[in-house]
Amino acid sequence: MRTLDDVDFSGKSVILRCDLNVPLDGNLITDDGRIKASLPTIKHLLDAGARITILAHLGRPKNGFQNSFSLAPVASRLSALLDLPVVLAKELSDLSGNSNSANKVQMLENIRFFPQETSKDEDERLDFAKDLAKFGDIYVGDGFGAVHRKHASVYELPRLLPNVAGRLISAEVEVLKKLTENPARPYAVVLGGAKVSDKIGVIANLIEKVDVLAIGGGMVFTFISALGHEIGKSMVDVELIENVKGLIKRAEELNVKLLLPTDVVVAPTFSKEAPATVVSINNIPANQMGLDIGPDSAKAYALALQGCETVFWNGPMGVFEFPAFANGTRAVAQALSEISGFCVVGGGDSAAAIRTMGFDDEQFGYISTGGGASLEYLEGKLLPGLIALES
């Protein structure tokens, strides 16, 4: 995979695929981490004398332009960070193809407003990529959070132009290689989030490689159910209970320390104001749902992680957006901020959680921008966006 250092960008028009998929509250960006993560590549290209056309997505819009998914707040924030105008183009026809234009940075509106970007039809994606390719001499791939998607701007477009990896993708791949090729031990993985179905593949793969596996978030209740406990109104993937039983058995066979909660925080409804109660996993009431791991479990998780030399964390331990159900996530974040080993925080929710709770990025070894992309890499899957950059 070639990098920015392998190319002279002077006078070139560059198509830069970024991951600028930031969380929004109305038009307010609540975490600009992904924008800041793109700056090293953008600044390198500008310093080298390139003119940049940025392609990026935001969320999953369904039917063309939707104001709530517009990149306008992103363009505005990027402009402030660069102290340069960033021109936002609504349509391809609004983009300038002139490398001598006074505008050094232009951004196409949310690439997912164009249905061809995510089309299942390869020919449709290729035709769209050909239209995009007219605006650049070279493609720079830097949207690590999207490299697991077979989308036109990620897979087809880089195959039509000379291509290189940006600073972010290069750094992400280097970090993930540390986790997969020869991690310092003990090696722990902490997985949270809502659905077991999103993580079952990576759990099955990692259980063969790790020393400690800690499970939290909504998906933990499928594990608790698999152990034979009642889980009340908690989230559960019923069709995966047998798979989860197999994972628990496999962990025992391999002597992997599988951390599951002994207590949880429950509430009658999914609400910020709902009264929170700590209960044992043996006594989850039928009319309550689990929304966080309990304080005893949080302490046990933190203790188990303290001596680890390599840790990968993806997904919060509970509904961290609600203060009453944020303590499990906070305890894990605190423990990981204090370990002397190498820690990778992966996934938008985990990164947003630590920033919301007042932690600094510098307190952790590496904050990854890739949620699903990181997980699929660790699962051993081939990622279309990386394949394209290696072609």
Where does each model-flagged region fall?
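Active-site loop-to-helix "anion-binding N-cap" substructures in soluble metabolic enzymes
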Residues: M1-S391
